[in-house]
């Protein structure tokens, strides 16, 4: 009997650790994305001198991967959900990091669609 209770205690500790880690990661992602979202509008206006129409077009293109999210997730069905989410977060991080290097509006479109693919992969998991 003690063997079962030891095993259950270890499982409970691992589960608690995983939930704490998950909570911390969700907080960090949410905080970082909130900072990005608030700075992005100013970056478009002040650095890239984008018009409201340009912003609307960019936002429209950014949502295309969202429409294709089920198809993207379906192609990765052989992977575990946690791996797909990790891939999505990595793509999002690289894309958002590359946003600051966009010297003009045209590269920004590609970068935004790129990180949107990762974000929508993550969000579907």
Task: Give the location of each predicted region.
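Helix-loop boundary and gating motifs at the non-cytosolic
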Residues: 6-66, 107-109, 114, 123
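Hydrophobic alpha-helical transmembrane segments of polytopic
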Residues: 22, 85-88, 92
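Generic alpha-helical transmembrane segments of integral inner-membrane proteins
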Residues: 31, 64, 68-71, 90, ...
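Membrane-embedded alpha-helical segments of multi-pass transporters/permeases
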Residues: 38, 71, 97-101, 124
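Membrane-helix boundary and inter-helical linker elements of multi-pass secondary transporters
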Residues: 48, 77-79, 100-101
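Helix-to-loop junctions at the C-terminal end of transmembrane segments
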Residues: 68-82
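C-terminal ends and interior cores of transmembrane alpha-helices
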Residues: 90-104, 109
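Cytoplasmic helix-loop-helix junction between adjacent transmembrane helices
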Residues: 119-125
